[in-house]
Amino acid sequence: PHLICIVPLILEKIYRKQIKPSLEKGVVKLAMRVPLLDTQVYASVCNRLTESFGGEFTQVIAGGAPLNSEVEEFLHKIKFRFTVGYGLTECAPLISYTYYKDFIPTSCGRVLDGLMEAKIDSPDPQRIPGEICVRGEHVMKGYYKNPEATRQVIDEEGWLHTGDIGTMNEDNTLFIKGRSKSMILSANGQNIYPEEIESKLNNMSCV
């Protein structure tokens, strides 16, 4: 295949069930501590992972859910050809994407130039997370025979309120933190996103 679109869970399962256990074996674990040998180990792992997806592809695009931070960091370390996209059914479906060579870790790509506009409902979109709002040719006109549901997500200016919370840098690259409905406001005013806690728990070997 030229292009592979998958959910993050597939990459995470391959990493936890196959890759991580193999790197914790005696000889391999020792080699990982030796300069130059570690790069050879990473190259070998990358080649095996690439072959497991058929070998002849340009890139793997993960989407549909957050990618575990440990898995993402490792895939970048071994130089695996992957990127992360972001979309909604209401946007038919892609909102942001970046070619793997230009992909920024922890992001979900750049808003599609010329097709989609995006803004963060925040006083400081680059630093303070807020709701991600989008509009453009690909955004739906409304839910079928459900004007009330449509009014709840699309405002008078045509912005679709996604319900996702995140930030956006100067070149319109999106960084998703979590869902507005799941966000917890602590007693000291700090926003807590369960998705970030879940990601850390998933990195534990006992989980």
How should each PLM-predicted stretch be described?
Residues 1, 5-6, 192-198:
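ATP-dependent adenylate-forming carboxylate-activation enzymes
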Residues 2-5, 14-103, 117:
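Gly/Ser/Thr-rich phosphate-binding loop
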Residues 9, 65-66, 138:
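Alpha-helix/helix-capping structural signal
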Residues 64, 140, 194:
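Glycine-rich phosphate/pyrophosphate-binding beta-alpha loops
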Residues 82, 90-93, 161-180, 194-197, ...:
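Extended, hydrophobic alpha-helical segments in both membrane/secreted and soluble proteins
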Residues 111, 119-186:
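Conserved ATP-binding/catalytic segment of the ANL
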Residues 201-207:
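Short acidic amphipathic segments
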